[in-house]
Amino acid sequence: MAEMTEDSKSDTARKQLVELVDLNLTSNAALNAEIDLFDRYISRLDLRTFETVWKWQNLSTEKIPGRKAKVRTPGRQQLLTLEQKCVVAKSVYKKMIEDLKIAKIHSEKQLDNYKATLEEADIHLAEIKKERSHFKRNIVEELEDKKSMTMSAEKVMRYIEDKIKAKDILIEKLHRKNSALLTHKKKQQAQLRQQEEMAEGVTVLDFELLKFENIRFRKQLDEQNLKQVNLKLLAVKTLQTLNSNKEKLHILTNESEMLSSDTALRTKLLVKIEEETEQAEEERHKAEALNRKLRDQLADFHVPHVLQYIKLKESHGQLQKSVREWERKVEIAEMALKTYTKSWDKLRFAAGAGLVPI
């Protein structure tokens, strides 16, 4: 029993310690939040303002009727009163409201800038689509047409150069307008400084009008600067597109030359094939004529009788035999002639008369 009692007491003490730790953690978190609040309040105050507020709060606390003034104990840290904490909280709350308003204004301004950027991008996209359709209608369709394949790249280059010149002229115009606005701005600023220095005959309304004019001219100047930057970006993109189109044009030109050479080669081959076809047709006609002639001869051919064939064969053999005999006789006569000629030459040489050609 004694052991159970001791265990229950230890559990109770442990639970109390845990609750005490949780309570201390919650209190420390609240104190840290309060310290952070005070730090933000103090960081916005300079030393003189802080001393003035502190003294005023002390005096207001001492003069409250029905409340006893607290006696300051030496060595004890002085804490803020509820009124001082309320002032700090109100100040921080007011500052937070102002920060929220500033953040809202800033976010709205950024949102307007994003909307303006999107509208500008849409305008640029529409211009690019328009230029693309114009380029396709005037250049690409003519290049794709088989009748205008002989057109050189000068037309494309001239078209792109004209577009770049137009962009450069617009940029130069905006530059001049921007310079005029800057000059006008400097003039207005000089007049404003002169009027401020003189401080004669200038009312608050004049200053407000000048401020309004200054804001308006600043806005116009910012718009012109933005347009100039956008035009520069557009010029860079146009140059990139020009380079890309030049590369594509070079590739297409090479392909066109290859196709032209291939077409010429195939044309020559076709002409050669046509010539060979014509020659084959002529040979075919000749062969057909020869075939018809042979067929006609074959139709008129009659086989002789056997006895007649034997007689003809026998007479042909006798004629061949007679031809061979006469050939031998001719050879014998030629040999005899050569022998007589040599003998005659020897006799003439021996007689000293010399050789006389026969």
From Swiss-Prot:
One of its GO terms (cellular component) is centriolar satellite. Keywords: Cell projection, Cilium biogenesis/degradation, Coiled coil, Cytoplasm, Cytoskeleton. Its main location: cytoplasm. One of its GO terms (biological process) is cilium assembly. The keyword Oxidoreductase does not apply. It is found in: Cytoplasm, Cytoskeleton, Microtubule organizing center, Centrosome, Centriolar satellite; Cell projection, Cilium. InterPro entries: CC_domain-Cilium_Assoc (IPR051885), CCDC113/CCDC96_CC (IPR025254). The keyword Thylakoid does not apply. Residues 93-138, 176-200, 266-343 form a coiled coil. Belongs to the CFAP263 family. Component of centriolar satellites contributing to primary cilium formation. In complex with CFAP263, acts as a regulator of ciliary beating that connects radial spoke 3 (RS3) to the inner dynein arm (IDA) and the nexin-dynein regulatory complex (N-DRC). The complex is positioned parallel to N-DRC and forms a connection between the arch at the base of RS3, the IDA tail and N-DRC. PANTHER family: COILED-COIL DOMAIN-CONTAINING PROTEIN 113, COILED-COIL DOMAIN-CONTAINING PROTEIN 113-RELATED. Forms a complex with CFAP184; the interaction is required for functional activity in cilia. Interacts with HAP1 and PCM1. This is Cilia- and flagella-associated protein 263. It comes from Danio rerio (Zebrafish).
